[in-house]
Design a protein with these regions (language model features):
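Flavin-dependent oxidoreductase catalytic cores
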Residues: 1-232
């Protein structure tokens, strides 16, 4: 819980590689610690020695013939939810696509264009660091109620600018994130996008919407990883 990959976690991921997995994904790495940190076990490339633990784990996976991958995420309006450091939790502001009040009473601020630009750039920066640490694939977490999903969802996203409204606009943040990652890692480096095919609650996006989202982002990704549901 120090932002690094510990020896037990490394052994767990190496065991997956030994078992014959084609790719093994480490989860889940924050891209923008200033506005994120939902639980105690997030990885954080800003922590001293974290990249050394990344490199060691990537090598442990690769030595068994599997491709080491890392999942990049941002919790958005649910940042701080399960943090064990309560002093940091209480000092962490929550941000999402639109201003609202969470079901637990926490106020959420609307991300400005400047903050969106900063988070988009952070995805690329962390992806580049992961590549230098020896990872050969990136998973971008865009499902289950985290920030990218919040932009995709009409339930969370009530913006009236270029990031809200129709599906094309609601996909704009995800598209920019994926493009930022691609620019950082270069060609020939697979990008996996993890998404909820349907949010499975009234007011969220449907399976038909999920198909449209996948089609909208198809040209930005190499692999689509579909599950279902959301934090909400």
């Amino acid at each position: 819980n120090d932002g690094c990959i510990g020896p037990k976690s490394t052994a767990f991921y190496e065991l997956r590689a030994k078992g014959g997995a084609g790719a093994v994904t480490i989860s889940e790495c924050m891209v923008h610690p200033k506005t994120d940190g939902s639980h105690a076990y997030h990885l954080d490339t800003a922590i001293l020695n974290s990249l050394a633990s990344f490199a060691y784990t990537a090598d442990a996976i690769r030595r068994h013939g599997a491709i080491p991958s890392v999942e990049l995420s941002h919790s958005g309006m649910y940042s701080g939810t399960y943090m064990t450091d309560k002093s940091r939790q209480h000092g962490l502001a929550q941000w999402g696509p639109s201003a609202c009040v969470r079901p637990d009473g926490v106020e959420v601020g609307e991300l400005s264009h400047e903050m969106i630009d900063e988070i988009v750039a952070a995805y690329g920066q962390v992806a580049g660091l992961a590549k230098r640490a020896g990872f050969e694939m990136i998973m971008v977490h865009g499902g289950h109620g985290w920030l990218i999903n919040q932009f995709l969802s009409p339930w969370f996203n009530h913006r009236t600018d270029e990031y809200g409204g129709n599906i094309e606009n609601r996909c704009r943040f995800a598209r920019r994130v994926l493009q930022s990652v691609h620019e950082a890692v270069g060609p020939g480096f697979p990008i996996e996008f993890r998404m909820s095919g349907s949010e499975l609650f009234e007011g969220g996006y449907t399976l038909e919407d999920g198909i449209a989202i996948a089609q909208e982002l198809e040209d930005c990704i190499d692999l689509l990883h579909v599950s279902a549901g959301t934090y909400q």
